[in-house]
């Protein structure tokens, strides 16, 4: 049963590099979006207008934290990463139907 030996020199280096590049791009994209979301949250934290309050009905707690915390909305607990409202325009994540 000596046929079960493995020869690691026959691994295709091109496919290995391609897989590493794809993984690196995906991880970098996730990190960039996360950092971008935190930067957007910092810029919109003290800048809440009536328009920002209205955005909470479409995207809950996207930027203006004080208004989200005052609304006693316990139907959707806050988990995961905040999505800035300008990344996904027009996306309706709330359960209510629009007017």
From Swiss-Prot:
One CC-aspect GO term: membrane
Glycosylation sites: 3, 7
Pfam short name (any one): NB
Record GO biological process: proton transmembrane transport
Keyword Transmembrane applies: yes
Function (record text): Putative viral proton channel. May play a role in virus entry.
Compartments, record wording: Virion membrane
Protein source organism: Influenza B virus (strain B/Victoria/3/1985)
Subunit structure: Dimer.
Domain of life of the organism encoding this protein: Viruses
GO molecular function list: channel activity
Keywords per UniProt: Glycoprotein, Hydrogen ion transport, Ion channel, Ion transport, Membrane, Signal-anchor, Transmembrane, Transmembrane helix, Transport, Viral ion channel, Virion
Virion surface side: 1-18
Ranges annotated as spanning the membrane: 19-40
Name of the protein in question: Glycoprotein NB
Annotated family: Belongs to the influenza viruses type B glycoprotein NB family.
Main localization, broad class: virion
UniProt keyword RNA-binding present: no
InterPro entries: InfluenzaB_glycoprotein_NB
Topology class, membrane: Single-pass type III membrane protein
Intravirion side: 41-99
